[in-house]
């Protein structure tokens, strides 16, 4: 099974039947039953579509409807036509659905459960508008199964739930030393069940050794543990930025940009700075029929973010580069860098 390839070339992950079952089991990521019909809009050559979509339903004795692609305009028509009752939905997909013009038919459908990854900030408004009864969320990876889970009814924005009992989990610094509670660190995992994580990367022995260093599987993702024990996703380690001596989460900057009414989609990346750290570039897709003034967007962010997290550059794009699984290819945006079309607000001097 190949990874999504968001940070570079896709890696072939050697998986076992136990690995696939542990990821897809309805006992882990939902309460699918024999009379359920899952809607699958993600490709079957990655774990989201195949394991969390089709396998999850088949293990429960249910059925799956596999569509060629996700479409925000026809989504609820498809749900009604096929009688779908639950689905795996990326947070970006939920946002696209939420941005569609309201309709009297928004609540006339059979969908009752959604596994949303990650949970969109407007979760309550989404559930109210579309009449979704239960929402769950989870964190998983091709290499290591479903590790963190917020069961149905317990999902909330910015958090991914609690560790599964059959995994050992730690948050560590760059030296693999466990960080204090409340501090951000890389999630590393070990399984208590044999064969429920990957056997290694296909024909990539050095990458296998690196990801398994010190006998822990390194996820490459940064988290912190909230006051209530919920695990909060911070960023991909490769997507995190360093600016003005501070660590900056692209995920947190994107979350605030998405609050602007003219923004349909955004990706934030670090670009080289003359100060040897990172400048921040926000690549924005504007909602159809609306306009966005980059200077106004930055003024909007000035009121919502610390100064060191506000982007220097803003560029409006027709679309963001994505993988077949609809994940944004940030590496492509980093390689593209700052173009002449980008709005540039030089950084303010700080005494």
Describe the predicted segments one by one.
Residues 1-22:
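Conserved AMP-binding A3 loop
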Residues 3-6, 38, 44, 79, ...:
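Conserved S/T- and glycine-rich ATP-binding loop of Class I adenylate-forming
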Residues 11-14, 40-41, 62-69, 136:
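Short beta-strand->loop structural element characteristic of the AMP-binding/adenylate-forming
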Residues 21-37, 45-85, 96, 100:
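Conserved AMP-binding/adenylation subdomain of ANL enzymes
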Residues 59, 76, 81-89, 98-157, ...:
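Gly/Ser/Thr-rich phosphate-binding loop
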Residues 140, 161, 221, 245:
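Active-site glycine-centered loops adjacent to acidic/histidine catalytic or metal-binding residues
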Residues 169, 175, 189-194, 200, ...:
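AMP-binding/adenylate-forming catalytic core of the ANL superfamily
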Residues 335-351:
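Acidic/polar alpha-helix N-cap and adjacent early helical turns
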């Amino acid at each position: 099974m190949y990874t999504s390839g968001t940070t570079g070339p896709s890696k072939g992950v050697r998986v076992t039947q136990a690995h696939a079952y542990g990821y897809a089991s309805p006992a882990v990521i939902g309460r699918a039953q024999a009379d359920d019909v899952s809607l699958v809009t993600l490709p079957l050559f990655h774990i989201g579509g195949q394991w969390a979509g089709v396998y999850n339903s088949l293990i429960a004795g249910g059925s799956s409807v596999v569509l060629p692609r996700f479409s925000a305009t026809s989504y609820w028509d498809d749900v009604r036509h096929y009688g779908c009752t639950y689905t795996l939905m990326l947070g970006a997909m939920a946002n696209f659905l939420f941005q569609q013009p309201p309709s009297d038919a928004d609540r006339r459908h059979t969908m009752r459960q959604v596994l949303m990854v990650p949970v969109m900030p407007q979760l309550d408004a989404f559930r109210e508008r579309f009449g979704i009864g239960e929402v769950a969320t989870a964190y998983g990876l091709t290499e290591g199964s479903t590790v963190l889970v917020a069961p149905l009814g317990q999902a909330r924005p910015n958090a991914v739930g609690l560790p599964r009992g059959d995994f050992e989990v730690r948050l560590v610094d760059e030296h693999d030393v466990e960080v204090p509670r409340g501090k951000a660190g890389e999630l590393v995992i070990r399984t208590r069940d044999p064969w429920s994580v990957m056997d290694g990367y296909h024909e990539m022995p050095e990458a296998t050794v690196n990801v398994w260093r010190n006998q822990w599987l390194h996820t490459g993702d940064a988290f912190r543990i909230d006051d209530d024990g919920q695990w909060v996703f911070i960023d991909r380690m490769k997507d995190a930025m360093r600016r003005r001596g501070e660590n900056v989460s692209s995920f947190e900057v994107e979350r605030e940009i998405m609050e602007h009414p003219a923004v349909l989609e955004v990706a934030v990346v670090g670009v080289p700075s003359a100060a040897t750290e990172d400048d921040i570039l926000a690549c924005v897709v504007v909602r159809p029929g609306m306009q966005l003034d980059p200077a106004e967007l930055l003024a909007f962010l000035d009121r919502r973010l610390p100064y060191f997290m506000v982007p220097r550059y803003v560029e409006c794009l027709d679309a963001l580069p994505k993988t077949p699984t609809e994940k944004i290819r940030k590496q492509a945006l980093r390689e593209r860098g700052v173009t002449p079309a980008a709005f540039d607000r030089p950084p303010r001097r700080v005494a």
